[in-house]
């Protein structure tokens, strides 16, 4: 719980300073003219704000280390988030610094997400028979995916990552 509060406070304190700073650096994405008209108001909106979110996560994990409350699950989730964050950073970097509005193409992003997802599933034991259950919250029911679990987990990770990216953009 303390890690959650710590991450929230970091974002709350840093983001208001980061947005004008990113504006100063002209880290805004140009919006393509062929897009919807209502999307044009986003032109110049600073990109790379995800860096603040990643910093907040790192600070909260460091807080957990100080409190002696860090688990391997938290470390693997940190790896997953940072690795997906690196993909997002590369995408934004190409858009802003290289002035290529599309950033990484969809195939490059998908390959990166699949590689990261496979690493995460492997590191978290998803390829062992012990980690194939999905517990349904507030019930005693567990759904066993068996040998298809790694594929279900990978599909979920890549799908969730893209859903977050779509709603953010």
Which residue ranges define each predicted feature?
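"…together with the soluble PPM/PP2C metallo-phosphatase catalytic core" -> "…together
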Residues: 1-169
